[in-house]
From Swiss-Prot:
Residues annotated as domain tr-type G: 188-357
Species the sequence originates in: Bacillus thuringiensis (strain Al Hakam)
Gene name per UniProt: infB
Name of the featured protein: Translation initiation factor IF-2
Annotated region described as G2, given as residue ranges: 222-226
Principal subcellular localization: cytoplasm
Keyword annotations: Cytoplasm, GTP-binding, Initiation factor, Nucleotide-binding, Protein biosynthesis
CC per GO annotation: cytosol
Pfam family, one: GTP_EFTU
CDD domains on file: IF2_eIF5B, IF2_mtIF2_II, mtIF2_IVc
Listed InterPro entries: EF-G-like_DII (IPR053905), IF2_II (IPR044145), IF2_N (IPR006847), P-loop_NTPase (IPR027417), Small_GTP-bd (IPR005225), T_Tr_GTP-bd_dom (IPR000795), TF_IF2_bacterial-like (IPR000178), TIF_IF2 (IPR015760)
Ranges for region G5: 333-335
Record GO terms (molecular function): GTP binding; GTPase activity; translation initiation factor activity
Ranges where the record places region G4: 297-300
Compartment(s) where it occurs, according to its Swiss-Prot or TrEMBL record: Cytoplasm
Length: 686
């Protein structure tokens, strides 16, 4: 008899993997997870256990007979008792009259109560409360407001406990959107899956392969519609896939406080191995704290080497189960559709172990996946219902917009009336276009939804005018003192891998007042927009060593208010972070980049050196500014301008979209395509 895995045995005997693992523990048999192999001896023991628990045929027959008899008896009782119905009603009415209202053990209130309201809560007559107040020297009428102290005084006289409720503003519904429901109200929901990985490793092909094999097969006449998410059905269970750019599912949405994804599928090409974006995807998934399933794609290629992929991923703490780890690896060929069913089975297995649940019997809450403005339909938004049930006609607040759900369309283009947890739907009826990652909540009353939506829009406008509270080195010490910061997230970029490792190792050793440094991402090369988005989502500081941010990264950093620190000496980085944590950071000057020029042509002139014919692409270049030469995103020289000319004339500055001639002091190795970045040092007002 061949060996069998835990999840395979569970499936064979129609039980959950979790229940089987519990059973094995009761039998003192150690299993690490659902992929553990069971030998023949253990399988025999389990067979005997489950055989013993099954009732015999005779027992089942006896139970069935009792049920049939009880049904017959109940029918007789029904006939017999029909004539006594009036008497029972009379007795019930009589008992109801003699019942006395019990005094409660505890009452709750918020703000204040009138005498009448307090009497109602205490189950007393208002005249009795007025009399008690009179005895305390307080002249009150039935509609008079009572303060907290008076309410407590009266309630204590009756021996009743008082609790004041703190009302959370409904405009900030994000604070109670994620409140835990009672366990008995929770029901199983489909897992929400995002596919991530390096460019050209087969993410889109895998999504298409899953969609074509599972979605269209079960939907006769259904039109697959791109709404940013879709559902597939496997073994009578559903899985929701987010069809968005991989990183957007984590960064943009997490930056707005939305946790959408339950499971990440990391696609790695078997012939290519781990690439820079693969590492980036791993760091995004780890920062979001979600399980990772590795799909080793392109197994049909002659150069496929899955062992190499496994080996490389162990460096990032993704150890295969076959090697004693807990990461699931699934070999697939997305283009040929091989291994897809196995991958979907593994997703269901992780869902079963993680136990994803939600309460369908409440007003819907969730997150915006995509949104756009359509000429014919107006505002269209794809929503992922994460809790509750959304219905057509529900008043809804989405981010700072509001409206009523006029129509709902499923991922296969069909109109639906209800959408439960983990279901993606496209809705119309909002007054303006929300942003991806905005939270939404349905309400009972349209007037209330409008009021909350308008209040949120006003609050957002006021908040936009104020400063964003992102982490920066300047206010780091103050935040540590106030207890707001327990861990500092850093993103480290450098010109070479050796510098990255040295800097990361040095930074990890810093520990001031129990506040530790956590490096969430490292990389080689220029600081990119993706780094800034991750920093914004994780409230991190970006540190660049011998590298610069590109134009898009700078623009995004200003927009998201992300702190970027650039250095050329490692110990200066360490000193600056330590000084900031100890509250001794006192920068007198701050570097301000004023412009960039691209070298279009070079001329070598005797006794002068290399003259660079440049085109100013951004800002301006001034005669007295410091400059640095950037080649392929890496700083190769830093110094001063020697000459700055327009045609044959010396000039003080050259503005954007103009050409100029530049020479650099003590540097002649200028090449076409180099970027000359000009900067000045400005005094910082403290």
């Amino acid at each position: 008899m061949s060996k069998i895995r835990v999840h395979e045995y569970a499936k064979k005997h129609n039980i959950s993997s979790k229940d089987l693992m519990t059973k094995l523990k009761e039998m003192n048999i150690e299993v690490s997870n659902h992929m553990t192999m069971l030998d023949d001896e253990v399988v025999n023991k389990l067979d005997n256990e489950y055989q013993a628990e099954k009732p015999s045929v005779a027992d089942e027959f006896e139970v069935e007979e009792k049920v049939v008899r009880s049904k017959k008896n109940s029918n007789k009782k029904k006939k017999k008792g029909k004539g006594n119905e009036d008497k029972r009603q009379e007795n019930f009415a009589g008992r109801q009259q003699t019942q006395t209202v019990e005094t409660p053990d505890k009452i709750t209130f918020s703000g204040s109560l009138t005498v009448g309201d307090l009497a109602k809560k205490l189950s007393k007559e208002p005249s009795e409360i007025i009399k008690k107040l009179f005895m305390l020297g307080i002249m009150a009428t039935i509609n008079q407001d009572l303060d907290k102290d008076t309410i407590e005084l009266i309630a204590n006289d009756y021996g009743i406990e008082v609790e004041e409720e703190v009302i959370v503003s409904e405009t900030e519904f994000e604070t109670f959107i994620d409140e835990q429901d009672d366990e008995e109200n929770l029901k199983e929901r489909p897992a929400v899956v995002t596919i991530m990985g390096h460019v050209d490793h087969g993410k889109t092909t895998l999504l298409d392969s899953i969609r074509n094999s599972k979605v269209t097969a079960g939907e006769a006449g259904g039109i697959t519609q791109h709404i940013g998410a879709y559902q597939v059905e496997v073994n009578d269970k559903k899985i929701t896939f987010l069809d968005t750019p991989g990183h957007a599912a984590f960064t943009t949405m997490r930056a707005r406080g939305a946790q959408v994804t339950d499971i990440t599928i990391l696609v790695v090409a078997a012939d290519d191995g781990v690439m820079p974006q693969t590492v980036e995807a791993i760091n995004h998934a780890k920062a979001a704290g979600v399980p990772i399933i590795v799909a080793v794609n392109k197994m049909d290629k002659p150069a496929a080497n899955p062992d190499r992929v496994m080996q490389e991923l162990t460096e990032y703490e993704l150890v295969p189960e076959a090697w004693g780890g807990d990461t699931i690896f699934v070999p697939i060929s997305a283009i040929q559709g091989e291994g897809i069913d196995n991958l979907l089975e593994m997703i269901l297995l992780v869902s079963e172990v993680e136990e994803y649940k939600a309460n369908p019997n409440r007003y819907a809450t969730g997150t915006v996946i995509e949104a756009q403005l359509d000429k014919g339909k107006g505002t269209i938004a794809t929503l992922l219902v994460q809790n509750g049930t959304l219905r057509v006609g529900d008043p809804i607040v989405v981010g700072t917009s509001f409206g009523r759900v006029r129509a709902m369309v499923s991922d296969i283009g069909r109109r639906v009336k209800v959408a439960g947890p983990s279901t993606p739907v496209e809705i119309t009826g909002l007054n303006e276009v929300p942003q991806a990652g905005d939270r939404f909540m349905a309400f009972a009353d349209e007037k209330k939804a409008r009021q909350i939506g308008e209040s949120r829009a006003q609050e957002a406008l006021l908040a936009q005018r104020g400063e964003k509270s992102k982490l920066s080195l300047e206010d780091l010490f103050q935040q540590i003192q106030e207890g707001d910061v327990k861990e500092i997230n850093l993103i480290v970029k450098a010109d070479v891998q050796g510098s990255v490792e040295a800097m990361a190792a040095s930074l990890r050793k810093i520990d001031v007042e129990g506040v530790k440094v956590k490096i969430i991402h490292t990389g080689v090369g220029a600081i990119t927009e993706s780094d800034i988005i991750l920093a914004s989502a994780s409230n991190a500081i970006v540190i660049g060593f011998n590298v610069r941010p590109d134009v898009n990264a700078k623009r995004t950093a200003e927009l998201e208010n992300v702190d970027i620190r650039l250095h050329r000496i490692i110990y200066k980085v360490i000193e600056e972070i330590e000084a900031a944590m100890q509250g001794m950071l006192d920068p007198e000057f701050e570097e301000k980049v004023i412009g960039q020029a691209e070298v279009r042509q070079t001329f070598k002139v005797t006794k002068v050196g290399t003259i660079a014919g440049c085109y100013v692409t951004d800002g301006k270049i001034t005669r007295d500014s410091g400059v640095r030469i950037i080649r392929d995103g890496v700083v190769i020289f830093e110094g001063q301008l020697d000459t700055l000319k327009r045609f044959k004339d010396d000039v003080k500055e050259v503005a954007q979209n103009y050409e100029c001639g530049i020479t650099i002091e003590r540097y002649n190795d200028l090449k076409e395509g180099d970027i000359i970045e000009a900067y000045i040092m400005e005094e910082v007002k403290r």
